[in-house]
Amino acid sequence: MNQFKEIKAEQLKGNPFRMIGKEWMLVTAKNEEKVNTMTASWGGLGVMWNKDVAFVVLRPSRYTKEFVDNGEVFTLSFYDSAYKKALGYLGSVSGRDEDKIAKSGLTLKTMENASFFEEANTVFICRKLFYQPFKENNFVDTSLIPNYYPEKDFHTLYIAEITKILVK
């Protein structure tokens, strides 16, 4: 753990639009027996309820969603471009079917009951505050539905307090 140092949200150097949308992130959560992770490129950072927060959206079919739903904390972690292949792999296979973490080549770490990977350059440890499933009748721009939800598998939105930011 000595590679990471804790910073305040105001000290974050990365651009969240690039970090999340272009470089991707891993959403990682654990239960008593297992850790699961998935690659995500949708989400955001901000302030809500006077707290620094992250928001992510997870589809009901994603195995990681079960871990996020059943736990109090999860992490968002970000990587240098050298890890893009590993992130692509982690986003394309399910932890239900194989030990994808072992096959990814990434090194699992745990801090404060939150799991993430040693290879990350930035880690947000997040505590869930709120969740809300998307509902079809709440879409103002209904053209999004056929493009992003042809199977009606609407995301669930999670808002989480960022309790710690770790950087290398």
Task: Provide a role label for each language-model segment.
Residues 1-40, 44-168:
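Active-site-proximal mixed secondary-structure blocks
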